[in-house]
Structure formats: structure tokens, C-alpha cells
Amino acid sequence: MNHLTTLDAGFLKAEDVDRHVSLAIGALAVIEGPAPDQEAFLSSLAQRLRPCTRFGQRLRLRPFDLGAPKWVDDPDFDLGRHVWRIALPRPGNEDQLFELIADLMARRLDRGRPLWEVWVIEGLADSKWAILTKLHHCMADGIAATHLLAGLSDESMSDSFASNIHTTMQSQSASVRRGGFRVNPSEALTASTAVMAGIVRAAKGASEIAAGVLSPAASSLNGPISDLRRYSAAKVPLADVEQVCRKFDVTINDVALAAITESYRNVLIQRGERPRFDSLRTLVPVSTRSNSALSKTDNRVSLMLPNLPVDQENPLQRLRIVHSRLTRAKAGGQRQFGNTLMAIANRLPFPMTAWAVGLLMRLPQRGVVTVATNVPGPRRPLQIMGRRVLDLYPVSPIAMQLRTSVAMLSYADDLYFGILADYDVVADAGQLARGIEDAVARLVAISKRRKVTRRRGALSLVV
């Protein structure tokens, strides 16, 4: 597809509406040394980028949004304009690295060129170096971006991700439309009932999403943002998370969100704010990407808006409430409504949807406090130019009054959390990261001392 979908174009519109927003997603790879020289790196990168034409294309915009932006080949494409090199004062530590990442992610990508950058970062302690890869969100969602980035490694990792992407289920209504008259009336009745049930769920989901967005949240973590950022990160062993999953029959995503909930609860308390039921309404993206669409560079997501239980003091109760609310949200109609809305929007004339999206972006959104996105990453360690990738940190942007975002990515034997925050209002981004690690450790300790017998639950990294 050469034209942006309504969702893809919405990420551009969010930047147009708020000059403080930079909607790039990123991945920070920390790599064993020594760093290659620039010529060798450019040569290797050029070879690996060749299969994906999107890296050599820029957007052609239509005046007054008369048509959807279109990807076109950039006749002036120069790899050297997309690959930059920078060094920390030796020996650079983690805090200095994260400060640099925050600064680089705050800078907008140039729309006159292909919408991506690679930063080679030298000067890390122990002869390590790093690569920050930035892609505009209109170009890819988290899953597509992760597969693109893994493709830059020394070997194809397409079969090595932490979990299979759920195959998007085909609507039963489609089979009714294609099938014409059915011989078996009971089958037609079953299909019609399923369609009506889907419509009812989608309508309920629409009301839930509207209520979530329009109801003001009691939190200082929602409001206008500046053009400066802070970045911090947490890292926990996947084996520890899986132990909690097995003990309490929950998913990896449940444990991760419960840890995030505890960390936000502590931050709110230290700010002198009372954690309430609606203090942490969270946008949780849900992938609708099928396995056959992994190579597509676009956005294929729906959403859920659960209230994470920051008002709950007990860690185990908090975990169980997170599990319960996510289970209900998955079974409810929020995802269905999101899918239906995007399908309808993509069939309407683009000027109409662009105007509607622009109007919605300008409304003061006070109901949602943060975004928490979870992407399955490579199960096996990657190598870049013969050097091991030691750590892989995700970065997701902030926008629409959300002053923090949390991105989660599994890599090899660990689960990584990347926190991007507004510089002026969220000085405690590092505390959020440490709080996540402490919360996971607390759940692990509880799982070791509690004697409960439960069946083994499925472990999944995709909501």
C-alpha cells in the first residue's frame, strides 16, 4: 500500500496540532565493542536495507488534505543523511546514554526525507557502543518496526520472536456476504447471531471508550507537554516473570502491567496525590496484525482503555484485578469498536476523515493518563556486524496530553521497559523505572512463599 491509512495519517496530524510532539518510535541496542568505522557501518546497513523499499521513500502530501499522503521514491535519497554518529564523554554511563536518547527522540524527523534515522553512539563504558533507530509512527507500529529492526541484524530473525502474532480472525459477516443463500438455515442463523453479537459488543465498546476519554482523570500525569523529554528504562528476567505467571495463572502482560501500576501508584503518593480508581486510565494498544502481514510497514492496531488499579495497595490483589480487567476488556467490545472504526474511516473520503481527526486532536483529552504498549521481541540474541546485542530498549512517544509512555519489549532472556516522559512535569521518570523492577521482584517473592495450586496459564506477549 502506497497511501497512508487514516490511522497512519493520524500520527502526522498529531504533530501538526501540537508543535511539542515528536511521534517517532525507537529502539536502543547496546552492543559489545568495538564500534565499526562509519564506512563499514554504512556499507553493511545499505545491504540490509535493500529488501525494504520504504527506507528509500518519502511522503508526498496533498494540499488541504485533499488526498491521503502517498509514499514515493526519494530521487535524492542519501544514506549518509540518515545515519549519524555521536559520542558520550568516556566512559559514558547509563544515565548519560538515556539523557542523550531523550534528546534525540524529542527531535522531529524531517518530512522532506524518508522518515527514519539511525544514530551510532560511541563512548560507552567497557568498550560498548549503541545504535538508536528512529522510525516515524506513520511508517510502522511496534510489531512491524521490531521486525524491520531485527532484519538489520546479521541473520534473519523472522522465526525467532517471543510469541506468534495472533492471526486476525476473519469476520463471520464476510462469509455471509460472500456465500449468498445458504442451504442450511441453522448455519445462516448462527452466522447472523454472531454478527449481531459483534455489533452489540462494538456498540458497548464505543460507549466505554467514549466514557474513558471524556471522563477527567484525577492525575497530574495528564496535561500539556513541552518539547523536552526524559528517558529511563527497566530490565527484569523473563524467567522471574514467567514464574509469577505459572504461580497465579496470569499472562506476562498481566505481570508487566501490574508492575507498572505499582510504580505509578508510588509516584502519585510521593507527589501528594491520592491514588483513585480512575487515576491511571491507560491506553493499551492491541495488535490486529496477522502473521502474513509481518512484513507490511503500516499500523494495524486497535485499543483498550482499562483503569489500572493504583488504588489497590496489596500487590497480589493488584495483579488479580489487572488480570480480571484485561480479560473483560478483551472479551468486551473495545477492540471490536476500534477495528470497526478504522475500517469505516478507511472507506470514507480522506478529506472528511482528516478533518475529523484534526478536530479530535485539538480537543483537550483529560481522561487517559498514559500508554503501555507490549511488543514481542527476538527470543535469541542478535548480532550486528559480528557483535552481540547485549540489551534492546524500546522507546514510544508521548502526545495528546499523555505526559508519560511505557513501552515493553522482550529480548532474549529479559523483559525491557522504556519510559519516555515530559521533561518539565515528570522529573521522576527514573523512579518509575526503578519502581517497575521493585514491583516485579516483590511479585516473585510472593510467588515463592505462597502455596497455591493453579493450572499452568498460557504465556503471551501480545494482548
UniProtKB/Swiss-Prot annotation:
Its EC number is 2.3.1.20. Pfam families: WS_DGAT_C (PF06974), WS_DGAT_cat (PF03007). Pathway: Glycerolipid metabolism; triacylglycerol biosynthesis. It catalyses: an acyl-CoA + a 1,2-diacyl-sn-glycerol = a triacyl-sn-glycerol + CoA; di-(9Z)-octadecenoylglycerol + (9Z)-octadecenoyl-CoA = 1,2,3-tri-(9Z-octadecenoyl)-glycerol + CoA. The modification N-acetylmethionine is found at residue 1. The active site is at residue 137. One of its GO terms (cellular component) is plasma membrane. GO terms for biological process: biological process involved in interaction with host; glycerol metabolic process; glycerolipid biosynthetic process; response to hypoxia; response to nitric oxide; triglyceride biosynthetic process. Transmembrane segments: none annotated. Induction: A member of the dormancy regulon. Induced in response to reduced oxygen tension (hypoxia), low levels of nitric oxide (NO) and carbon monoxide (CO). It is hoped that this regulon will give insight into the latent, or dormant phase of infection. Also induced when grown at pH 5.0 for 3 weeks. GO terms for molecular function: diacylglycerol O-acyltransferase activity; long-chain-alcohol O-fatty-acyltransferase activity; O-acyltransferase activity. SUPFAM superfamilies: CoA-dependent acyltransferases. Optimum pH is 4.5. It comes from the Bacteria. Keywords: Acetylation, Acyltransferase, Glycerol metabolism, Lipid biosynthesis, Lipid metabolism, Transferase. It is an enzyme of class 2 (transferase). The keyword Acyltransferase applies. Disruption phenotype: No detectable TG under hypoxic growth conditions, or when grown at pH 5.0. However, about 30% of normal levels of TG accumulated when grown in the presence of NO but there was virtually no C(26:0) TG produced. The keyword Endoplasmic reticulum does not apply. Catalyzes the terminal and only committed step in triacylglycerol synthesis by using diacylglycerol and fatty acyl CoA as substrates. Required for storage lipid synthesis. PANTHER family: O-ACYLTRANSFERASE (WSD1-LIKE) FAMILY PROTEIN, WAX ESTER SYNTHASE_DIACYLGLYCEROL ACYLTRANSFERASE 4-RELATED. NCBIfam families: acyl_WS_DGAT. Belongs to the long-chain O-acyltransferase family. This is Probable diacyglycerol O-acyltransferase tgs1. It comes from Mycobacterium tuberculosis (strain ATCC 25618 / H37Rv). The gene is tgs1.
